[in-house]
Amino acid sequence: MADLQGKAVLTIAVPEAKADQIEAEILRLRAATTEAGSVQLEQFDRLEQVFLAPSSYDVIFSGHIALPAKSHADSALAKLAAALKPGGRLALRESLNSRNETALRSALTMGGFVNVQVSTSEHALEAHADKPVYEVGAAAPLKLSFAKKKQSGAAAPAAQVAEVWTIATDDFDDDDLLENDGDELLDAEDLALATTAPEGDDCEVGAGGKRRACKNCTCGRADAEAEQAAKPTLTGPLPASSCGNCYLGDAFRCASCPYLGMPAFKPGEKVTLSDRQLKADA
C-alpha cells in the first residue's frame, strides 16, 4: 500500500478476530498514519447496519485482521465506495471459497470502482481498487457556444411542408355541438352503472360507530381495509455486541460502538447508557 501518513483509515475486522489481533493491527495503522491521520474500526458482520459518513476515508481495509472476510455483498461494496473520498483506495481480502477472481473483479467494477486488481495468494483472494476522482452525480461545466454561424451562401427557401394535422373550420357546426345532450353519449350499460353505484357514505356502520365495507363493496373501502390489515408489524431482537470486546476499552471498540468514550469495565458489569448514547450519530 501507499504511504498512510496523514490518511483517514477504516479497517474492518471479521468476527473471528481476537482482541489481541485487533489491538496489534490498530497500533500498526496508527503508527503508519501518525498523529495527522486517524484510524477507525468496524465489524464485518455489522457493515450493513452501521452508518459510514460519505467521502470520509482515504483507505479502507477489509478482511486484513486475522482471517480473510467472506464474500462482500454488492450493497456492502457500494457502501464502502460511498464512504471513500474521491481517489480513495479499497484493499480487501476474501476467503478462497467465496468466489473466483473474475466474479470479484466484476463485483468491484459494478460497485463503481476503477483500476481493479485481483490476485490469488496462498490463503486468500486479494483485491485493490480505487474510487474515481469524482463523486457520483457531480456537476461539471460544459463549454457551449450559441453564436450564430455565418452562412457561406444564400439561404435556401424553406421547404413547403404539408399540413397533415389541419382541420377545416367549416367541417363543424357550432350550433350542433351546443345542442347535443351529454346523456346521448352514454349507452345503456353506462347509465345502469351510474344509477346503481353506491354513495360514498353508503357503507354499513359497525361497532363503535365506525363504517365498514359492505359484503359486495364497490366503493373501494374493502380494498383499503384489506391493504391496512396486510401491513406487516416490524419485530426483531434488540442490537447486541458483535465483537464482544466492548468492555476492554476504546482501543477494541468499533467506531459506532455506544460505549465509545467510556472507561473499560468488567464483563457482566451493569452499565447504563443515556438515550443520547443509544442513538447513532447522523
From Swiss-Prot:
Keywords: 2Fe-2S, 4Fe-4S, Cytoplasm, Iron, Iron-sulfur, Metal-binding, Mitochondrion. This is Anamorsin homolog. GO terms for cellular component: cytoplasm; mitochondrial intermembrane space. A motif (Cx2C motif 2) lies at residues 254-257. It comes from Monosiga brevicollis. Its main location: cytoplasm. HAMAP family: Anamorsin. Component of the cytosolic iron-sulfur (Fe-S) protein assembly (CIA) machinery. Required for the maturation of extramitochondrial Fe-S proteins. Part of an electron transfer chain functioning in an early step of cytosolic Fe-S biogenesis, facilitating the de novo assembly of a [4Fe-4S] cluster on the cytosolic Fe-S scaffold complex. Electrons are transferred from NADPH via a FAD- and FMN-containing diflavin oxidoreductase. Belongs to the anamorsin family. It is found in: Cytoplasm; Mitochondrion intermembrane space. Its cofactor is [2Fe-2S] cluster; [4Fe-4S] cluster.
